[in-house]
């Protein structure tokens, strides 16, 4: 059964998933562990001094961070973020399974913690696929509909909602079919910025070209 992580990887690049399946990474990345730990301290961080906040790995200034946490405190997700009924839960659905960092009950929805940077607006496609997968798995476990998921970026003090719209469900289903049909290395991506940050770029052999070379 595919994991949430495998689906997110396939949404980013199916070939990257092939390499990860062949050579699985060891354990949870340290950056992910630090991000989750940071996300458990919001009640203290929202009132912390600049000096105290500078001791944490934040992606924004202390003033911006406090302002964003104060805005989060006014949202209905604050209780779930700071005192979730479930945390680090293994959720198994009909088609996929994986770990959910936090689970809220009112409303029922999963929260996925990301160590990375948020998109300028909305949620990155791989994270949307992962969020939909987690929401559907949670709905299967609880035998009740789940309408949304949250993606949390603790280093930025940002939380984005992913609704289970028809478009997001379709994106998830396409990715699930791609993962289930993966047999051997998929075709390489060509001339994409995604390859530049890939750990398997050298092994994959994908070549990216500059604008100068294209001209």
Name every feature range the model reports, one short phrase each:
Residues 13-17, 184-215:
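Cysteine-cluster motifs in flexible loop/terminal segments that predominantly coordinate metals
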Residues 74-178:
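Mg2+/Mn2+-dependent nuclease catalytic core
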Residues 181:
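Long C-terminal interaction/binding lobes of large macromolecular proteins
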Residues 41-44, 170, 184-185, 195:
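Short, intrinsically disordered/low-complexity patches at protein termini
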Residues 49-51, 141-144, 151-156, 188-195:
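Noncatalytic linker/hinge segments flanking ATPase motor cores
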Residues 23, 139, 203:
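Hydrophobic/aromatic-lined pockets within catalytic cores
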Residues 1-108, 208-215:
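Metal-dependent nuclease catalytic cores that hydrolyze phosphodiester bonds in DNA/RNA
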């Amino acid at each position: 059964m595919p994991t949430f992580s495998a689906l997110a990887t396939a949404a980013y690049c199916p070939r990257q998933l092939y390499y990860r399946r062949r050579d699985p990474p060891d354990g949870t990345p340290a950056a992910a562990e630090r991000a989750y730990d940071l996300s458990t301290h919001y009640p203290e961080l929202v009132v912390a001094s600049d000096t105290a906040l500078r001791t944490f790995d934040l992606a924004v200034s202390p003033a911006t961070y406090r302002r964003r946490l104060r805005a989060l405190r006014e949202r209905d997700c604050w209780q779930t973020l700071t005192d979730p009924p479930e945390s680090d839960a293994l959720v198994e659905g009909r088609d996929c399974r994986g770990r959910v960092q936090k689970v809220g009950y009112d409303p029922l929805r999963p929260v996925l913690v990301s160590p990375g940077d948020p998109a300028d607006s909305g949620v990155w496609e791989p994270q949307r696929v992962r969020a939909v997968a987690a929401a559907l798995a949670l709905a299967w476990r609880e035998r009740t509909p789940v309408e949304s998921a949250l993606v949390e970026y603790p280093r930025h003090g940002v939380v984005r909602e992913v609704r289970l719209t028809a478009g997001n469900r379709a994106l998830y289903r396409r990715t699930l079919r791609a993962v289930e049909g993966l047999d051997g290395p998929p075709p390489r991506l060509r001339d994409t910025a995604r390859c530049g940050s890939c750990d398997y770029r050298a092994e994959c052999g994908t070549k990216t070209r500059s604008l100068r070379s294209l001209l």
